[in-house]
Amino acid sequence: MYSLARPFLFSLDAERAHGLGLSALDLAYRTGTTPLLAARIAPMPSTVFGLTFPNPVGLAAGLDKNGEHIDALFALGFGFVEIGTITPRPQAGNPQPRLFRLPEHNAIINRMGFNNAGVDALVRNVERARNRRGLLGINIGKNKDTPNEQAVDDYIACLDKVYPLADYITVNISSPNTAGLRELQEETALRQLVSQLRDRQEDLAARHGRRVPMLVKVAPDLSDRDIDAAARVLGELQVDGVIATNTTIDHSKVAGDPLANEAGGLSGAPVLEQSTLVLRRLRSRLPESVPLVGVGGILSGADAVAKMAAGAALVQCYSGLIFRGPALVSECVEAIRRRREAPSRGAVAPL
């Protein structure tokens, strides 16, 4: 079914196609026709962060920024769906055009800039969702006009409001499309930010009688030294998990494409290798008690298995969904299922 719709969607402006595609998913969900788009997936429970996921394949943040399509996205078979990135106040993001497909490379460049309706709107949308078939992650960020020195206030504002509704929360400090945001990954800034968020997390756990795991999402463009420093900080602060990785600012893998010089983060097939290298190095540096979520360049079941072999406990896709359609979800789940049945093939490769 998606193979029939894709040529039409790809004939449209990428951001318009994004909205139209989500509307179509909502319609399919309401009319009970989602099975025409996505195969039924047998359960494959995976316990990570103390949570049991129906299966280990999730949707990465960015597709549903405001949590408006939760039920429809779960109907595609994802074991978990991550919504956001959300900020305390609504913001328009960067000027359009800001989303570009590179079909020859199975890649996307985006410079969206955390466009979203604000955390209060997301909370209302999550409260309206009625059929959460998996676990819900909420990805939080800071407003563009909030200086890094005050970034913790934005993250705490979001953390407080989404905590009662989320199964887990992701702290996004790695988008390349908010000026200066990635500076929060520097060792001193990272320690200062995450230590305050960890304190708030424990306060909220006591207040709500429920501990919601908090993850940190990192960039693929970190040097080995920066990766090691981040692992040291995040391990010492006992974060619940790390998502590796966000989009890359390195466009060398798409050099020569007419859109290669568009500013923004590159995702899709060209980021697979580098994001997996970062994942593998983090796994070797972090305590085993800190699970990893592998994301970046998953366009096949084999790609998902490669992430697991590099040390991921869960995987996420986004760009792959755009190029492959909903069939990618079941393909990834079944590939991981086969790997579980033959675990000798899943040893973490050395650096």
UniProtKB/Swiss-Prot annotation:
> What organism does this protein naturally occur in?
Stenotrophomonas maltophilia (strain K279a)
UniProt entry tagged with the keyword Isomerase: no
Give the pathway. Answer: Pyrimidine metabolism; UMP biosynthesis via de novo pathway; orotate from (S)-dihydroorotate (quinone route): step 1/1
- UniProt similarity note: Belongs to the dihydroorotate dehydrogenase family. Type 2 subfamily.
User: Enzyme group, top EC level?
Assistant: oxidoreductase
Q: This protein is called what?
A: Dihydroorotate dehydrogenase (quinone)
Q: What PROSITE patterns does UniProt report for this protein, alphabetically?
A: DHODEHASE_1, DHODEHASE_2
- Identify the residues that bind substrate: 65, 110-114, 172, 177, 246-247
The cross-references to InterPro entries, in alphabetical order and at most eight, read: Aldolase_TIM (IPR013785), DHO_dehydrogenase (IPR050074), Dihydroorotate_DH_1_2 (IPR012135), Dihydroorotate_DH_2 (IPR005719), Dihydroorotate_DH_cat (IPR005720), Dihydroorotate_DH_CS (IPR001295)
Major location (coarse):
membrane
Cellular localization per UniProt: Cell membrane
* Cofactor comment text: Binds 1 FMN per subunit.
- Identify the coding gene: pyrD
**Co-factor(s):** FMN
